[in-house]
Amino acid sequence: MHKSVAPAPSILLLGFMASLPGFGVDMALPALADTAASLGASAHGASLAISSYMASFGIAPLVYGPISDRYGRKPIILIGCVVFILASIGCALAPSLPILLGCRVIAGLGAAAMALAMAMARDVYDDSVFRQKLSTIVVAIYVSPIAAPIAGAAVLALAGWRTIYVGLATLGMLLLVGVWLGLHEGSKSRQPGRLRILAMIKDYGRVLSHPACRSYLLASATSFGAVGAYATGSALFFIKAAGMSPNQFSLIFGLTSLASAAGAVLDSRLAAQGIASLYTVAGGLAIVVLGSTILTAMTLAGWTPIAVTVSLFVAMTFSVGGAGPGIMQGSMQQLPELSGTISAAGNCLAMVMGSLSSGLAAIFFDGRTLLSTTVAMLLCSTLALLSFLAAARGTTKPCSVPS
């Protein structure tokens, strides 16, 4: 049932909101070399424009989540939009690398408020309706890695790297207007005193000490870890070992991103038909475990034909995309009054696990095979499946299980 009636455009705005942080990363990627040359910096120095943004984006939601549980989501999101706009303009005008990096850190702080999109949807929708709407948001998140680099490359070719940040500021302005006019506050769980540091710590303690919620968050983080290992490890394998060009690999990465989006769309359709997320999540994660096991065995046998390997990656990313909305729904339905805190914790844990798994896949890459990638994916997906099953057994609000 609906908790409240939200205007139809709201969920589209939430999808736009959730995808904006990804645009902040992926639109800037094609311009790193030009940025370095323009500012007299090294390639490594220019790449810090990405990592500095991601670091602040990963940490800031830990503060925004509890604040939004106290004051509501919309004010935090509006402030985040303004910060993102101003910082992006600062990036466009930056005369040196240190100023660019400082503005990117601030832009990440603003973009971090967009992580509240999930919590805002949870405030408005409940049960299978929430899962359907959440799938729409997830589709937007998965599509952004395809659209953003293309847009960034086009802008770079037409007007230079600084215009990319003008474009990001423009996206921020569009979102600001959309949120101001089109989104309505749905949080009803505001509590005085929530801003105190000890109260915030207590909220996170409640979330992490709740067995089912903790297991859902671990399942979410480790499933994202499998994706992180794939993203880094597959690039190393296909480009360095298989000899593909970056453009050829981008086609494979785009295909798997579309597969993830298609999985989320299918989950939305299944939710509309009353199919419980218990089945879609468990089935999806089991496919990832099976696929990574097969790829590991193929790698050890020295047989990894490109067509078969890509097909398995497509199947696994499709399955992760289909499982994601159900995992997020499960985590937030345990403590709905702390949806912002749960969303923030999930975002931070996912960033940490994604960075860890992708780092390990890169560190242990042997220059020839997919072994480090497939093992990392197997470990992450197995832990995700076990965590989800533990959460499903221990949940106190099993609304995702059919009656």
Segments (PLM) and residue ranges:
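Cytoplasmic helix-loop-helix junction between adjacent transmembrane helices
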Residues: 103-141
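Paired small-residue
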Residues: 83, 87-90, 98-106, 307-313
